[in-house]
């Protein structure tokens, strides 16, 4: 919402800026609206501002003293001061604008007064010089200076006197001896008996407070009016009670809508919007409870509805700024112009998105290159198998091969028929993933599936129930490092099976 800027204080009234700042709220920086005071720290704020702040933090915004809403108290004096300040502000600004600039005559007249005073001081005594200067001031400035000097004398004699009584004393004292009274102002001040008599105090018959005699009439009027106000307040209705706080987490949507309907608020929107609407109503209602003449609930509801409409209008205007709008009657040329204007308007945003995409592409490219380099490493870089690993880590034989391809040695053949090529070579044994298949079986047998091997009885020799010696173990490791033909594979398998003996025969031997 657009708010008209307040006019600044002119240089001649710069002193008023301090008073202006003291009459403003420390939260909204506007003039106090239903001012309330925090008794713990004596800081003042608008009632609505401090209640909204306390809904988030229960402390003073200035000094962080712990405060709750029931601790707040009205400060009617600040409200009256704000009203007087707004009234005086317009008149002071108008007076400052309409008053003519200061003429140089006043400065020359002051110089003349100083010169005359110095000349008289050299020729005559001090009292006579003061009298001449007073006469000169009265002749130059007229009645205005005469009245101002009279007021100063009266303030020195009796500072508690009112303007009405001081005006009467001024006329009687100054009309008799105008020059002598003015000359006495510059000399030593000696209180007279007439002024001492005016300081006598009299007790008020209503409240019993001792009041100066010249103020007793005004005090009596205020006392009597105060008693009438008290009686009228007692007879009038009691102060409006504020609404209690609501725990929204425990309320269902149905109960929340029921509360809104109770005060005449709208029930449209989701739960968060309903909660926000109810909170605003409670804050404004409780703030008006502190006012001398609070607004009704219907007026507060109207204000909330107008605020929501203004907020929605602003949000819609912001959305329309970032959206291209077309109509059916627009030509292709007009549509292209809208597109070009949109591109020019959001060129910086487009460039920012392009830069972000390029940075992300560079990062992903580096990651993909590093992954490709890892996959292209040769197989020789893999760690070699340790020679002391057990035989179970060797690749196992496929069970789907035909039994005819596995030549078995007779059990009664001696073990000395082992081939000479099965010599242990335990240094630098290495293997690859494909060795486990090509070293033991020919390619035709791998391509053509065969019948599964039939089950054998327990008393016959099986490949699972074998005992490996150190010679056969070294032979197996040696075979993995060489490419062999199918015939050599059969011979190697035959030599390996020499060690295989049935358990019954092994026990007999």
From Swiss-Prot:
Positions of region (Disordered): 365-401, 435-509
Residues in RING-type zinc fingers run 25-64
Keyword Transmembrane helix appears in the UniProt entry: no
Task: Report whether Kinase shows up as a keyword of the record.
Answer: no
Principal subcellular localisation of the protein: nucleus
Bias (Polar residues) ranges: 435-446, 463-473
Intracellular or extracellular location(s): Nucleus; Cytoplasm, Cytoskeleton, Microtubule organizing center, Centrosome
Task: Provide the alphabetized UniProt keywords.
Answer: Acetylation, Cytoplasm, Cytoskeleton, DNA damage, DNA repair, DNA-binding, Metal-binding, Nucleus, Phosphoprotein, Transferase, Ubl conjugation pathway, Zinc, Zinc-finger
Provide the top EC class.
transferase
Concerning Gene3D superfamilies, the annotation shows: Classic Zinc Finger, SAP domain, Zinc/RING finger domain, C3HC4 (zinc finger)
**What catalytic activity does the UniProt entry give for this protein?**
S-ubiquitinyl-[E2 ubiquitin-conjugating enzyme]-L-cysteine + [acceptor protein]-L-lysine = [E2 ubiquitin-conjugating enzyme]-L-cysteine + N(6)-ubiquitinyl-[acceptor protein]-L-lysine
- As stated in the Swiss-Prot or TrEMBL entry, residues carrying the post-translational modification Phosphoserine are 99, 103, 158, 164, 485
Q: Which ranges belong to the motif LR motif? A: 232-240
What are the recorded Gene Ontology BP terms?
A: DNA damage response; negative regulation of DNA recombination; positive regulation of chromosome segregation; postreplication repair; protein autoubiquitination; protein monoubiquitination; response to UV; spermatogenesis
User: What does the tissue specificity note say?
Assistant: Expressed in thymus, spleen, brain, and ovary.
- Where, in this chain's numbering, is Zn(2+) bound? 204, 207, 219, 223
A cellular component term from Gene Ontology for this protein is: male germ cell nucleus
Q: Where is the composition biased (Basic and acidic residues)?
A: 493-509
List residues, modification N-acetylmethionine: 1
What subunit structure does UniProt give? Answer: Homodimer. Interacts with UBE2A and UBE2B, one homodimer binding one molecule of UBE2B. Interacts with HLTF. Interacts with SHPRH. Interacts with SPRTN; leading to enhance chromatin association of RAD18 and RAD18-mediated PCNA ubiquitination and translesion DNA synthesis. Interacts (via C-terminus and phosphorylated form) with SLF1 (via BRCT domains); this interaction is required for efficient repair of UV-induced DNA damage. Interacts with SLF2. Interacts with SMC5; this interaction is increased in a SLF1 or SLF2-dependent manner.
Q: Which PANTHER family match?
A: E3 UBIQUITIN-PROTEIN LIGASE RAD18
Family recorded in the similarity comment: Belongs to the RAD18 family.
Q: In its UniProt entry, what is this protein called?
A: E3 ubiquitin-protein ligase RAD18
Q: Which organism is it from?
A: Mus musculus (Mouse)
């Amino acid at each position: 919402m657009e708010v008209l800027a307040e006019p600044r204080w002119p240089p001649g009234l710069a002193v008023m800026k301090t008073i202006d700042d003291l009459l403003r709220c420390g939260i909204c920086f506007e003039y106090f609206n239903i001012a309330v005071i925090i008794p713990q720290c004596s800081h003042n704020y608008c009632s609505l501002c401090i209640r909204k702040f306390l809904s988030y933090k229960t402390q003073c915004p200035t000094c962080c003293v712990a405060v709750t809403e029931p601790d707040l108290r009205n400060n009617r004096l600040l409200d009256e001061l704000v009203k007087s300040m707004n009234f005086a502000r317009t008149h002071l600004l108008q007076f400052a604008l309409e008053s003519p600039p200061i003429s140089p005559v006043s400065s020359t007249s002051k110089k003349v007064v100083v010169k005359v005073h110095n000349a008289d001081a050299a020729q005559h005594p001090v009292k006579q010089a003061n009298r001449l200067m007073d006469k000169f001031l009265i002749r130059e400035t007229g009645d205005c200076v005469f009245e101002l000097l009279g007021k100063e004398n009266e303030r020195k004699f009796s500072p508690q006197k009112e303007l009405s009584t001081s005006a009467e004393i001024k006329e009687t004292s100054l009309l008799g001896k105008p020059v002598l009274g003015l000359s006495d102002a510059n000399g030593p001040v000696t209180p007279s008996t007439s002024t001492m008599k005016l300081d006598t105090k009299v007790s008020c018959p209503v409240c019993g407070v001792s009041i100066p005699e010249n103020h007793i009439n005004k005090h009596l009027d205020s006392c009597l009016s105060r008693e009438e106000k008290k009686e009228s307040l007692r007879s009038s209705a009691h102060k409006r009670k504020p609404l209690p706080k609501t725990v929204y987490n425990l309320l269902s949507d149905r109960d929340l809508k029921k509360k809104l309907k109770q005060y005449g608020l709208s029930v449209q929107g989701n739960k968060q919007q309903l909660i926000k609407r109810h909170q605003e109503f409670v804050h404004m209602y409780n703030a008006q409870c502190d006012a001398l003449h609070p607004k009704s609930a219907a007026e507060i509801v109207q204000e909330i509805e107008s605020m929501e409409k203004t907020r929605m209008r602003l949000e819609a205007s912001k959305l329309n700024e970032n959206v291209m709008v077309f109509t059916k009657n627009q030509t292709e040329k007009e549509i292209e112009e809208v597109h070009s204007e949109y591109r020019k308007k959001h060129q910086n945003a487009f460039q920012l998105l392009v830069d972000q995409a390029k940075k992300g592409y560079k990062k992903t490219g580096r990651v993909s290159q590093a992954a490709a380099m890892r996959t292209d490493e040769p197989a020789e870089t893999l760690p070699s198998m340790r020679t002391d690993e057990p035989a179970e880590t060797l690749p196992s034989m496929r069970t789907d091969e035909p039994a005819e391809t596995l030549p078995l040695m007779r059990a009664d053949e001696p073990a000395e028929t082992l081939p000479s090529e099965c010599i242990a070579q335990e240094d630098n044994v290495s293997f690859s993933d494909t060795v486990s298949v090509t070293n033991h079986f020919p390619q035709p047998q791998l391509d053509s599936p065969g019948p599964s091997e039939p089950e054998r009885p327990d008393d016959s020799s099986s490949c699972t129930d074998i005992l490996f010696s150190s010679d056969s173990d070294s032979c197996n490791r040696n075979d993995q490092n060489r490419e062999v033909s199918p015939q050599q594979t059969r011979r190697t398998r035959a030599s390996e099976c020499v060690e295989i003996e049935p358990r019954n025969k092994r026990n007999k031997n």
